[in-house]
Amino acid sequence: MSEQLVFRAIADPTRRSIMAMLSGGERSLNDITAQYEMTRPAVTKHLKILEQGGLIRVRAQGRQRLHALQPGALKTVSDWVSFFDQFWDEKLANLKQTVEMDDD
């Protein structure tokens, strides 16, 4: 899975909303479409982008295709955010040290 595909997938608020819905468990296309004021093909396009990003998986159950969050797929995003957490933690620690030295 490409990092670019993951970030592209989560860039859209509708896709983030679909992911939040899927955090409650598997849903069919009909269940997902019923929650949005958009056409079935539009929802299908969003789901395809999420699947390409590795954020959801699809499985067949009879005639239905059930969509579910893919465990661990957000690790790419988490790792990216963690890098910047460490960066800012270091910058803030340096600022604190500078301020404390100025107080002396």
Model feature map: region roles:
Residues 8, 20, 51, 57, ...:
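A cross-family signal for key residues in well-ordered alpha-helices
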Residues 51-62, 66-68:
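Beta-hairpin "wing" of winged helix-turn-helix
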Residues 1-2, 75-104:
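Amphipathic alpha-helical dimerization/coiled-coil segments
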Residues 2-41, 65-79:
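N-terminal helix-turn-helix DNA-binding core of bacterial DNA-binding proteins
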Residues 47-48:
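Short, hydrophobic-biased segments on the C-terminal half of alpha helices
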Residues 26, 51, 100:
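Acidic-residue sensor for enzyme active/binding pockets
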